[in-house]
Amino acid sequence: MSDEQHQNLAIIGHVDHGKSTLVGRLLYETGSVPEHVIEQHKEEAEEKGKGGFEFAYVMDNLAEERERGVTIDIAHQEFSTDTYDFTIVDCPGHRDFVKNMITGASQADNAVLVVAADDGVQPQTQEHVFLARTLGIGELIVAVNKMDLVDYGESEYKQVVEEVKDLLTQVRFDSENAKFIPVSAFEGDNIAEESEHTGWYDGEILLEALNELPAPEPPTDAPLRLPIQDVYTISGIGTVPVGRVETGILNTGDNVSFQPSDVSGEVKTVEMHHEEVPKAEPGDNVGFNVRGVGKDDIRRGDVCGPADDPPSVAETFQAQIVVMQHPSVITEGYTPVFHAHTAQVACTVESIDKKIDPSSGEVAEENPDFIQNGDAAVVTVRPQKPLSIEPSSEIPELGSFAIRDMGQTIAAGKVLGVNER
């Protein structure tokens, strides 16, 4: 990886519209996949009678999924262009993966929306665009994929562009901030070089559009926030919490605090990829050892931050949520599980403060009795156990969450304000 600026890129869109193939193609065209790996995948795919899957295979690290011909792995794949180092927050389309989309898109700076030319806007296309808008993704590149299946027809392309523009208007996403490109990820059209099949199109190709995305605001200005994924005991070192730096910088010698467990100590060592490093920056996955903090003092879901600017712990918080799939209605007192960063905590909806018109963002109703599928609302939430969470306007990386119940994602949201304990 070069010292270029970093972008986290969400790939969103309906299942089977070709997201994995597009990602594989991007990795392939930017030289991020060794040639021999592609050849090997090609042979495997042909053996199994799925000749066209060599790119999707690049994305596919799960042997069992490979057998079923479905790709669902959210691999943090990386590739570089002339301008940026990209990490792909791959967002597969399967319904249960909306939660990953929520946790993924919240880390994403921009997004590529994949829409199949032969299928147009589908329910998940709508859901993903709505989420992208709710979670604050600023720029959208719309890849109208599978152009080879409609014989590269301009009228088919234009029809899909109109459908997507209507959808963007519905969710108040400024289509001025969207670029539309006719592509075939499978054949490679308009990805890394202009296609001879789309003579009627004179816009940018995908890699050019990616190069021109606006640079993300560097999150290092924010204080250190590092959600803990696991806590290990390693002989000779002691207790080693592991997690990804979301904001700020973790330095050896720092005094840090873990919330909500409320323990603190001095960072003795920081390790990344089995090597000791003096510091860790946003996006780095690290293990570190803190003097005086034992294995039973901290747990997954804690957030590490500076001792003099510790992570917020919410007594209650106000949030804007979007209800995606709930079998009936949500009323005050509803207590599902909130998934925020690495924490999973049951939380009660204490009050439904406002219903929001999702298409305009205006207040549709004050203090409604209930909300249901498709509604956006501002709610006040009380965690049943201590939860560290931050307003998304201050630290967006720790300000979004998914709400799950009955084995599915019910809603997604972002934190507006925290009333601290």
Swiss-Prot record:
Residues 184-186 are annotated as: G5. Its EC number is 3.6.5.3. Residues 4-220 form the tr-type G domain. It comes from the Archaea. Transmembrane segments: none annotated. CDD domains: EF1_alpha, EF1_alpha_II, EF1_alpha_III. GO terms for molecular function: GTP binding; GTPase activity; translation elongation factor activity. It is found in: Cytoplasm. Residues 69-73 are annotated as: G2. PROSITE patterns: G_TR_1, G_TR_2. Mg(2+) binds at residue 20. It holds the Pfam family GTP_EFTU_D2. Keywords: Cytoplasm, Elongation factor, GTP-binding, Hydrolase, Magnesium, Metal-binding, Nucleotide-binding, Protein biosynthesis. GO terms for cellular component: cytoplasm. GTP binds at residues 13-20, 90-94, 145-148. Residues 145-148 are annotated as: G4. Belongs to the TRAFAC class translation factor GTPase superfamily. Classic translation factor GTPase family. EF-Tu/EF-1A subfamily. GTP hydrolase that promotes the GTP-dependent binding of aminoacyl-tRNA to the A-site of ribosomes during protein biosynthesis. PANTHER family: TRANSLATION FACTOR. This is Elongation factor 1-alpha. It comes from Haloarcula marismortui (strain ATCC 43049 / DSM 3752 / JCM 8966 / VKM B-1809) (Halobacterium marismortui). The lineage of its organism: Archaea, Methanobacteriati, Methanobacteriota, Stenosarchaea group, Halobacteria. The gene is tuf.
